[in-house]
Amino acid sequence: MRNFTHSLFLLLFLTASSSVFGQITIAEARLLGANANVTFRGVITNGSELGLIRYIQDATGGLAIYSSNFAGQLNRGDSVEISGTIVDYNGLFELNPVTASNPFGLTTLPNPQVVTPLQLNEDLESELVRLNGVVFADGGNTFAGNTSYTFTQGAEQATIYVRNGSPLIGQIIPVGSIDLVGICSQYNAIYQVLARDTNDFIVPPGINIISTININNLQTNGATISWETDLAGTTEVTYGLTPLLELGTLSDNNPVTAHSFTLNTLLPGQIYYVQASSSLNGDTSSSSIQVFGTQSLSAGWIKSYFNHDVDTTNGSTLPELAQINMLDDSLIAYINRAEQTLDLTIYDFDNASISSVSDAINAAYNRGVRVRFISDGNQAATNLGTLDLLPAIPQLLSPVGGNFTIMHNKFVVIDADHEDPNKPIVWTGSTNWTDRQINRDPNNVIIFQDQTLARTYKLEFEEMWGSTNENADTTVSRFGFEKQDNTPHEFVIGGKRVECYFSPSDNTNQELIKTLLTANDSVQFATMLITRYDIANAIDTLIANGVIVSGLIDDATSTTVFTQISASMGNQLFVNPDTNIIMHHKFFVVDAETENDPIVWTGSHNWSSNANTKNDENTLVVHDAEVADWYRRAYFRLTHPVIPDSTVGILHLESTSAVQVFPTLVNQPSAIQLVSSSNEPASIQLTDMQGKILYNGKLNLKKGQTLSLSMLPNVADGLYLVSVRTSNSIFSKKIQVVN
């Protein structure tokens, strides 16, 4: 849409040249703007492959047409006279409603204008364009619906958008340099190309890469890069520690169509950039630049914590998975480990009623740790925890307004570049840093000790930060739709395969569906919401194939997708009945009870279009039987709670309490203190996690007065439950004893 100040001369000219419904050019129609009733003649440049919308073009310009009544009559190549009203739909001028359509038969399509990505603008809106020599970042993968794909032309980049129902869905994304034809469209000030079908991808003559670039066999000193070409040619790999590929090119001149090259002189725990090429008779086909990380020398352990009970049946060797009312203390303990660097991102942050995370961050800064902090700009007024940070700590708010939505990450990167590979830590998951999220809403945290993954998260952080030093640079920082798919996705951590995806650049939803569909026996999911029909379709496909699917969502009324999956899942679909809490998990488990590649999917990414295409999110996928068992146990306890249950859960939850017990991490229970908001007698009990009573006594609560629980006995290291009972309530809190 253009904003024009129409001069009196222009208005008089247009009025004189045509009546309101007299035939005018498309350029003249666009000048009249929204709400104008117009009639013009042009050529339809697309058919049903783009859905109901049609685009029409004449020698002066183009316009979109949206009409369920006339769409079936308008096909690619039709010459038509059309009448209707111009509207502004999210920045795109389109005719809606259409009042008349008069066909004049088939004609030749206009020649597309040859442009570059930066030239996609208002002047080309709704017109056919051609961009020569573009390379898709996701080349070799397959197209999915309702998804944008980035392509580059030299230093410039833009996107194509593939709608649901497009004939491109399931087709291979072109690899290497091609010429792209499509319609220049706009959505909320973002100009994009709409490719109609595979004929819009023009492959140059000569040798061409025809497969994805596979990077596998990750080792501490290298990896194997493989691809295929349509003709036999050379095998060339150009690589480096930066996108400049400064380490040079290695090649094998033996002509083959199945190419494989192993790099074996690389450094452990490093991120590398690589480009594959094949040449024949002077022609060269090159891939986009790919990113991968070598295996690190880290110990490679993985831990998960839940702020609610988990099923402990036959789990005598389980780690302490349930960290009820303790995730804040655990986070602080990890922050306290930082020796050199600490990068933090958080969506929602308030220290009220939790241990002060800000104090731990400040302490890290005061002991010489470089601290960088990113939070969501939309939450600036309520993220009170950021106000508790030292003024010297650099902070960056994500941009707001326009096409930006939310920075929804909740990750922490500790000592990513430490010379000791056993120091780097990544903390992430679904948990925000607030009382509600830590102590009430069901959530999880997953922690990795791995240098390659830590450097990957640092790379993502610095894309948003805009620099590699302590000062953010907003002139080059990228959030949301601006971000690029520029991080490794495959890792080997402690011998386990791990995948990592960041939204919205990495098309996480496509990976989610792909991972779901690997299930052979069972899937359990716990997710706050599902608003995408392609995920619902995947669930239906699994059930039709005999996979047992069980799921838990927060709210059945928030999406019509619920109607679809409830029909196929029946009583295996659970809904959070407690409106006082949010079932905030975003995880699923695949084949946890079999040997068929057990998988856990978790992170901050909700199962929605905004999460996939707009929000800043992160996702981890762990292929491991033990980790899958942890999440299966968490899911089972959420959907089959123990009654009575005085901890965070779905069917019973302590949402408010007149009693506070602190701290939750002590060397002995006698160090615990208690504060009450009422004056009344109470009983106090200390039990172990098997229910054995270790202490049972009485005390008098005093409003606002801190009471010492010095009467509690000494115990061995482990988890225990402190319960306080009054005449009308029971309060319980887990504590951890560590000597």
Q: Residue locations for each model-derived region?
A:
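Short, surface-exposed linear motifs at loops/turns and structural transition points
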Residues: P205-Q295
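C-terminal outer-membrane/trafficking sorting elements
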Residues: F21, T242, L653-N739
